Amino acid sequence: MSSIPTQNIYDDPKFFKAYSTLPRSQHGFDAAPEWPVLQEMVLKNNKSGHSGIENEHVLDLGCGYGWFTRWARENGAKYVKGMDVSTKMIERAKESEQDLREKGSIPPSYGTLCYEVGDIETVSFSASEIDSYDLVYSSLTYHYIEDFSKLLQQIRLCLKKGSPKDGSRKGGRLIFSVEHPICTAPVNPQPDWKVLPNEDGDGVGRKIWPLNSYSDEGPRVTSWLGVDGVRKYHRTVETYVTALLQNGYVLTGLKDWVPSEHDVEEHPEWKDERHRPYFLLISAEIHSDY
């Protein structure tokens, strides 16, 4: 059991109002620069030869406004479930779904989509959900989770198990993104970038990313969107990968996400973001012999 009560900052009216103004909230994937890489992870062939999500059962943990759940259904998933600890998030996702229905934008051929308020920190699955999901997806949620290993164990229970002998059934997949550990590491973080004096003395400083306490894992408390006490959990890249391997997963993809040169051409304001990774993107699947 978690030693610290689950944090639910998104139901704070002040925070939720501020969050709703973010580009990601208003424009979804169009404002999520890491999405093309995540999308490729979802759709590409993995080591078991699996491709796409057509007719799959998909679970989105920390679904927020439901951007991914709707995308999964549009791309052929047979059943999609979104879960979030925030009642306000789930209400917003349901409102978007209702808007689509009223506009007649949900063809009869689309699969089932449902939402549930649930605490991912203590998630457990019904008997009908055990060994039932082809894909568990999560975007920018797991760095809020205290016991990542425990969560991986629960997810493994609900993912479909593969057929190791004849390969007739492919193992379920886990794909997720988190804030990169280089970003979550600093204790008492100051403004993101620091400027060093230029050695040439021309007055133009050089930006660096201040990194400290990388190996000291655990909670980090920051202020975000005008709300104090926002709690995240810092883990090293090694810890994320080791937890997967120790809990019966095979690593199939890992990306230290930075903007590409093409991204910077379209968004010059992202130039400094190429100096350090901002997101960690990981794909894995169930180990058939675990």
Please name every model-derived segment.
Residues M1-I53, W67-W71, R92, D119:
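Conserved class I S-adenosyl-L-methionine
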Residues N55-H57, G172:
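Nucleotide donor/acceptor-binding cores
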Residues S149-K170:
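A short glycine-rich, Lys/Arg-flanked "PGG" loop and its adjoining helix->strand segment in the class I
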Residues T239-Y290:
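C-terminal lobe and adjacent flexible extensions of AdoMet/dcAdoMet transferase-like proteins
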Residues L59-L61, Y65-V123:
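Class I SAM-dependent methyltransferase SAM/SAH-binding core
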Residues E121, F125-V136:
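A short acidic, Gly/Pro-enriched loop at the edge of an enzyme's catalytic core
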Residues D134-S149:
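A short SAM/SAH-binding and catalytic strip from SAM-dependent methyltransferases
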Residues G162-P164, R173-T242:
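SAM-dependent methyltransferase
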